[in-house]
Amino acid sequence: MLIAVRAAVSAVVLAVLSLLGVTILGASAAHAVDTTLVGSFTAPDGSGIPDVSITVSDEAGFSETGTSDANGDFAIPLPGGGTYAIEIDVTTLPDGIALENPEDASRSLLVLGGEKKIITKLVEGEGGGGDDGGFLDVSGDQFLQLLFDGILFGIMIALGALGLNLVFGTTGLTNFSHGDLLTLGAFTALILNEAGLHIIIAAPIAIVIAAVLFGWGQNKVLWRPLRRRKTGLIAMMIISIGLAIVIRYGVALFFGGAPRNFNQYAGQPGIEIGPVSTTPKALILAGLATIALIITVIWVQRSRIGKATRAVSDNPALASATGIDVEKVIAVVWTVAAGLAAFGGIYLGLTQDNIWNMGQRVLLIIFASVILGGLGTVYGAIIGALVVGVFIQLTSLVIPTEMKTVGALFVMIVILMIRPQGILGRRERVG
């Protein structure tokens, strides 16, 4: 019976995800402050090419032209996130140097916020040729940069995916408001930050507040009474969709629709680590997030309440019969999940921007990570997030940047056709 119910829930989830995907992928990225397009023009011999002209514009009327410096580098400030048209003036390239892919002279680029780096490959002669820049022609530096960016993005997604998977494993609830827990965590930190607390102090306080108020409190006020009334999983899932809408537009009502940044670390100069460029805050956040994920995994595997969580996830009725307080376990899981989500929201806000629909923008990716890794599995959520994060970045090598999320979701579909239970999920037999 339980398997049949979960199968029905899964079917509804896939249908809702399809509709949600159309909405998210069709929406334009929100505008942010301190958004910059950076890149470089490097000759085949490795030397920088100066005085190359590049123009960036959007449909709102923004247009800015920049030129590369003596090292071939350029940085063009943007008004915020969005889709931009990039035009490279090939007449400013030196004689004997051309774009390997002529289509790079005019292309569109989706920028979510922060610092966006583009890499343009140059060759000797007229360029182009019969093979104009497919995946096999990508430079090693470009591949490593995208791989690195994908890992960092995957770590951030894992914070949301792990909490979502813990809640699903213990309650069977497919929580469509989980992405908005990221938003609430980020805006809690933003309130404290704007009240005068440094973000280093505001962030951990916000995580604790979010864990207690939006995790434990939400379960106490909403989900526990619904479980006591034997509300069905599909009905609870629909309630979570309504809750997500209420949270999302509530944040928009009280904070406005414009993006907002924290008072510290909104813009940082990039650093070079070999062929990879990043920012100090991105490295620190990724390191702290990795530590948080490791601690959570150890807690689930080794602690008494963690073992009880696994028992409830396997069979709630049997766990209750052996003396485990199922409701206490669920309350703890909700608290941990909300804390991880709040951390993910602060991570997202520091690296991109804080805006009312920031959680919705990554919700589909979080669901994809959970489904790909395996529903109800701790390691699966993390591995799924890393796989999705890396594929989202790497697929931009072969498809337009604004469609890179589609490529990652296509890979997820292919993997699920081969292994329906996900990478680490367990196969269940019906009947």
List the predicted regions and their residue ranges.
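Single transmembrane alpha-helix segments in multi-pass membrane proteins
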Residues: 143-190, 221-231, 235, 372-378
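Cytosolic-side transmembrane-helix boundaries in multi-pass membrane proteins
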Residues: 82, 231, 325-328, 400-431
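Helix-loop-helix "hairpin" substructures at the membrane interface of multi-pass membrane proteins
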Residues: 277-354, 383
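Alpha-helical transmembrane segments within multi-pass membrane transporters and channels
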Residues: 198-243, 383-384, 388, 419-420
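Transmembrane helix-bundle core of multi-pass membrane transporters
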Residues: 234-302, 329-332, 406, 430-431
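Structural motif
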Residues: 38-50
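Inter-helical junctions in multi-pass inner-membrane proteins, predominant
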Residues: 142-146, 300, 333-370, 395, ...
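Short, acidic Ser/Thr/Gly-rich low-complexity loop/linker segments typical of extracellular
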Residues: 61-73, 77
